[in-house]
């Protein structure tokens, strides 16, 4: 069935799968961090501080992400985003004694960069895959991708709470890191190379 699909549809499905998997784990991670560190006795201000770098570095990445995608290719920015999210999750697998506010803030900074790289790459890639002049199709494809964001975030929040209850913080983070690493490897193998890259003139 996969082989019968057009290359554009295959790329669209791959990009959408990347985006959905990332959004789910991103939402779950945020809920895990809030609940876990609240359980450890962190004050509301300390918990809020954990996400400061997430937002700041996300804004910075949003400003330079388009330029970076044009320079190195959207496939690379998407794969870098996935890899950085795996790294951010791995940072939270250290012993509990090392999970200081500063350490978790650094992990969240990586996650914030990863989020905006992934989001920018997904949206821009979809626009390139739709044939020129097919504005209605472009609207539907982008709407299907981005319209699912809030719903997936909500599912991710719920998933984070459930995972924390069922298997605990460390195992939940490990499970998400492994799942996202599998998605990352598939993306490395299957995502079109030089997607969105501005080619240098000879």
Labelled PLM ranges:
Residues 2-56:
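Helix-loop boundary and gating motifs at the non-cytosolic
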Residues 55-63, 153-154, 158:
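Residue-level signature of mid-helix packing/kink "hotspots" within the transmembrane helices
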Residues 107-149:
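Cytoplasmic helix-loop-helix junction between adjacent transmembrane helices
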Residues 188-202:
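Flexible cytoplasmic inter-helical loops of multi-pass small-molecule transporters
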């Amino acid at each position: 069935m996969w082989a019968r699909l057009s290359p554009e549809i295959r790329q669209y499905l791959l990009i959408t799968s990347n985006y959905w998997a990332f959004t789910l784990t991103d939402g779950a991670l945020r809920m895990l961090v809030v609940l876990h560190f609240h359980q450890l006795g962190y004050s509301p201000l300390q918990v809020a501080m954990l996400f400061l770098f997430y937002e700041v570095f996300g804004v910075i990445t949003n400003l330079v992400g388009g330029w970076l995608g044009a320079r190195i290719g959207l496939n690379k920015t998407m794969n870098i985003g996935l890899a950085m999210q795996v790294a951010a999750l791995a940072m939270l697998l250290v012993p509990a004694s090392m999970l200081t506010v500063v350490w978790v803030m650094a992990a969240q900074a990586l996650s914030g960069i990863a989020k905006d790289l992934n989001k920018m790459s997904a949206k821009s890639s979809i626009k390139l895959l739709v044939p020129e002049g097919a504005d209605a199709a472009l609207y539907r494809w982008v709407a299907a991708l981005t319209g699912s964001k809030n719903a997936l975030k909500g599912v991710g929040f719920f998933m984070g709470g459930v995972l924390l209850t069922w298997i605990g913080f460390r195992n939940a983070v490990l499970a998400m890191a492994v799942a996202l690493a599998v998605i990352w490897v598939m993306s490395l193998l299957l995502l079109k190379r030089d997607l969105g890259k501005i080619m240098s003139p000879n």
